[in-house]
Amino acid sequence: MKTQFAILMIAVVLMQMLVQTEGGILGKIWEGVKSLIGKRGLKKLDQLDDTFDSDLSDADVKLLREMFK
């Protein structure tokens, strides 16, 4: 029982160390990938920018007013 508890505590400590350093390790890996691909390859990485069009045309406003009457 004592051995299992000791192994559990060592595993918890090692997991905490991994979680604390994970951001640094993954950040360095991501920087390496970005430098390999270059800025041009990562320029349009987020495709959701096209879906959020903040400009509403007059026809859009008219349709919204009709819908919410």
Curated annotation (Swiss-Prot):
The keyword Signal applies. Expressed by the venom gland. GO terms for cellular component: extracellular region; membrane; other organism cell membrane. GO terms for biological process: defense response to fungus; killing of cells of another organism. It comes from the Eukaryota. The modification Isoleucine amide is found at residue 37. Keywords: Amidation, Antimicrobial, Cleavage on pair of basic residues, Fungicide, Membrane, Secreted, Signal, Target cell membrane, Target membrane. Residues 1-23 form the signal peptide. It is found in: Secreted; Target cell membrane. Residues 41-69 form a propeptide. The keyword Translocase does not apply. Belongs to the non-disulfide-bridged peptide (NDBP) superfamily. Short antimicrobial peptide (group 4) family. Amphipathic peptide with antimicrobial activity. Shows antifungal activity with MIC values ranging from 25 to 200 uM. Does not show antifungal activity against Candida glabrata (ATCC90030) and Candida parapsilosis (ATCC22019) (MIC>400 uM). This is Amphipathic peptide OcyC2. It comes from Opisthacanthus cayaporum (South American scorpion). The lineage of its organism: Eukaryota, Metazoa, Ecdysozoa, Arthropoda, Chelicerata.
